[in-house]
């Protein structure tokens, strides 16, 4: 049974490597957030750049230190994501920044969360090779996210944010690759 679990982990790890490599490039992200239950919407557009991070690189070593992982533990791969976002309805700059992702086993380590600047972890899995599902929990909230690669030029994302079992917000995204 132990070897089966190792095999499953190896499959997940090879899938996350491939998923991050296929996501490399510049993307235009259009998204809409729905606040529940009142339905208030917010429309955003972001320019996103994704860079693949190889095992052992400085960024992944720093990420492992932030998460207090043993020095003998190496994240298998990762991605650096930078963004610049604009509120479409208000026609003003909303945010810009970057975040690091690093994978080990079925855990995705991040240097910050969606709603916190503190390091967070997410459980991840692949229902199929082109769809990455994440579940992150912190500050009493649960973030469930699905990222789906559609061919080589498009991605869709959906995020559901819940607290105490009640859904608070849904984010839906369509992302178009600009440069690979």
UniProtKB/Swiss-Prot annotation:
The UniProt record lists the keyword Lyase: yes
Disulfide-bond pairs as recorded: none
Lyase keyword on record: yes
Listed EC numbers: 4.-.-.-
GO terms assigned for molecular function: lyase activity
Keywords noted in UniProt: Lyase
Enzyme class: lyase
Induction: Induced by nitrogen starvation.
Listed Gene3D superfamilies: 2.40.128.20
Function: Covalently attaches a chromophore to Cys residue(s) of phycobiliproteins (Potential). In vitro does not act as a chromophore lyase for ApcA1, ApcA2, ApcB, ApcD, ApcF, CpcB or PecB, the lyase activity is therefore unsure.
Family: Belongs to the CpcS/CpeS biliprotein lyase family.
Designated name of the protein: Putative phycocyanobilin lyase CpcS 2
Organism: Nostoc sp. (strain PCC 7120 / SAG 25.82 / UTEX 2576)
Gene name of the encoded protein: cpeS2
